[in-house]
Amino acid sequence: MRATEVLLSEKPFIHEETVLKNTQLGSFTEVGMSNFIENSVLDDYSYTGQFCFIQNTTIGKFSNIAAMVRIGPTDHPYERPSLHHFTYRSKMYGFSDQDDMPFFEQRESQIAKIGHDTWIGHGAIIQPGVTIGNGAIVGSGAIVTKDVPPYAIVELVI
């Protein structure tokens, strides 16, 4: 379906092959094809392009998120002897009856915040816990590791 054929309404429009886990969508929102969104909020009148991967994030109203954007990528435990996920997914490997839940809770607590009326360009990456201020623009391919003030324009690696 072409974007010009979509008619938005109070009910969010979710394109095919999208996975939503513990996520709230506002009115007149559109979620692009093949997105994965987890532990997040997409407020009214905001949209995502195709192939976005968003975790642990709140997104304000009228936000424009281009294709292939990554927000809130989860980290590996670099303070441990190994970076491999067997150290916190020990149940998966048969090492324990349970996974390292405090590690997962700590990951989920690092909320990325995207303000109202923002534009996140194609292929941008926004790290966990970063705030993008209202009206800010994040250029295509930018890697954002620290907060962006309202109405700022950022490009490349900052």
Q: At which residue positions do the language-model features occur?
A:
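Conserved functional loop/turn residues at catalytic and ligand-binding sites
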Residues: 58, 146-147
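Flexible glycine-rich beta->alpha loop in the catalytic core of nucleotide-sugar glycosyltransferases
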Residues: 76, 142-143, 149
